[in-house]
């Protein structure tokens, strides 16, 4: 997808605001953090001299959602849609990462408003948010969705790579997880807050739906150079992501486009709380938590939660797994 720099030079209102918001999402390769869109909307309202400095942040969120809904009315006719998807690593972790990467996600963001010809500096405190807006193809099959951007060999590589990610995620590794993992840090913080025990022993099990580049270079239908170039492009398009350790996994755009395909094709169990696909978060560590699928006879993976869903579950529901009864305080698995 061609990338266009955002240019807003004239006052905009109504349909024009919706148009610019759509352009902004497309300029971000079709996936945009909620706070970035709130800031873009504020900028548009400022240029149109319609910025209401008295609005709460929730009113801005509501107005953004109204515009997205209006955009979707027209996009649906073309076979596209902007969907809302929450990142599995949680609000706190996403916000921390966003602050590190983009100046626009600072807690106190200056928005210049015009009131009676005077410039008024209004400080806006953006919320913690793990919500992203993703521009997706509503085509009926995964092949059709991918064919608009990738050739057949590239599509076959993506399907093969995704299978490798899923196989990797089935394996629970015994031993300490990476202390540098933002998921490990966030889960440990949640456990301490839930128990009040700052000396709580860290879990010694983890799993990961990621695979190293060396393994991915084993694909036979493309050269190593082609695979390297494709991986870079997939990361740019937010289909895959690359970890600090050089491993690759599926990113939000891939989940948004192919969630139904992934859950059915690979017999993945969804988050116990929100029932959406979860490939980062927390899994029950008790082996007896695995259930046998009545249709296939295969054992499913144990219960899994997104980070925020896990926090809600152990805080408001139970500190024990509802399937096997084991303690989630001591018998958990980091899914990183």
Swiss-Prot record:
Sorted UniProt keywords: DNA damage, DNA recombination, DNA repair, Metal-binding, Nucleus, Transferase, Ubl conjugation pathway, Zinc, Zinc-finger
Keyword Zinc-finger listed: yes
GO annotations of cellular component type: chromosome, telomeric region; nucleus; Smc5-Smc6 complex
Protein's cellular compartments: Nucleus
Catalytic activity: S-ubiquitinyl-[E2 ubiquitin-conjugating enzyme]-L-cysteine + [acceptor protein]-L-lysine = [E2 ubiquitin-conjugating enzyme]-L-cysteine + N(6)-ubiquitinyl-[acceptor protein]-L-lysine
Zn finger limits (RING-type): 268-327
Enzyme class: transferase
Name by which UniProt lists this protein: Non-structural maintenance of chromosomes element 1
Source organism per UniProt: Saccharomyces cerevisiae (strain ATCC 204508 / S288c) (Baker's yeast)
Gene: NSE1
